[in-house]
Regions:
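A short coil-to-beta-strand element that immediately follows conserved catalytic motifs
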Residues: 65-74
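Short, well-ordered beta-strand micro-motif
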Residues: 19, 89-93, 113-116
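Residue-level preference for beta-strand/loop junctions
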Residues: 11, 68, 84-86
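Conserved Nudix-box catalytic region and its N-terminal flanking loop in Nudix hydrolases
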Residues: 21, 25-61
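Nudix hydrolase/Nudix homology domain
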Residues: 36, 106-145
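Active-site-adjacent beta-strand/loop module that shapes the phosphate/pyrophosphate-binding cleft
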Residues: 76-101, 131, 135
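Acidic, metal-coordinating catalytic segment for phosphate/diphosphate chemistry
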Residues: 1-16
Length: 145
């Protein structure tokens, strides 16, 4: 979602999450319209809270329903995509989600995979790879997506 303020640049906000399973793997999705593997997520719609948006996007893109609170990681500048774009990033533990039972493969999502964060596939996006490395190595995250 982009908020346009009179005479100012728009502020855009999105959400993504690292959804974990019992084996410690992380869910990634491949979209039909862009290259690479991403954490599931998307834009915050007008009237939504960030967490409400995250829940909606996880259901739409990954067939995942939140049953507990996601854990806040941080907000990251995604200026490489758009000057005022920011991504709110969360983790969702295995105990805090369930399957919706609906397969989201179709118009928007072409593939869903579970990957070991220590050895992600070669075609994860740069921002996804940065977050995976931070999950594995710990420490303070970078400020850029």
């Amino acid at each position: 979602m982009c908020v346009f303020l009179s005479g100012r640049r728009p502020f855009c906000g999105g959400v993504r999450a690292a959804v974990k399973n019992e084996a410690g793997e992380v869910l990634l999705v491949r979209h039909t319209y862009v290259k690479g593997l991403y954490f599931p997520g998307g834009g915050v719609e007008r009237g939504e809270t960030v967490v409400t948006s995250l829940g909606r996007e996880l259901e739409e893109e990954a067939g995942v329903r939140l049953t507990g609170a996601p854990s806040w990681v941080g907000i990251f500048s995604n200026h490489r995509v758009m000057k005022n774009d920011h991504v709110c990033f969360y983790t969702v533990e295995a105990s805090d989600w369930e399957s919706t039972g609906i397969n989201p493969i179709g118009r928007e999502i072409s593939e869903i995979i579970w990957c070991d964060p220590n050895s992600p596939p070669d075609d994860v996006t740069p921002g996804t790879l940065r977050r995976l490395r931070e999950m594995v190595n710990g420490g303070a995250p970078e400020v850029y997506w």
